[in-house]
């Protein structure tokens, strides 16, 4: 059985959307929500890097794709949560206890991912000269 064929940008956008969907569900711990928020932002950043033709390294350290985006002349959206705080969920809190005092709210996680999504969708559309790349994945 064959399905639609997607390019790397589209695959990363699809995977980011899957991680973002977890934030809207119920029953997940704060660590899991933070992890999926971090993963969504990471994949969105890497989708934009792919769109501008930059090969990204496989790392969960969000500062690295951010640095590559800045070097490529791209910007980051202003978000309620800094990348450094999200980064903790990909590494430290996957294997350690998350103190309640450092836990961002679900609202902050959703807003941060949503701002990145909107930013990346807009940039991919502008850079490709067409909404087709984004529309192919948002219609799934």
Where are these regions (language model features)?
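Terminal alpha-helical segments
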Residues: 1-140
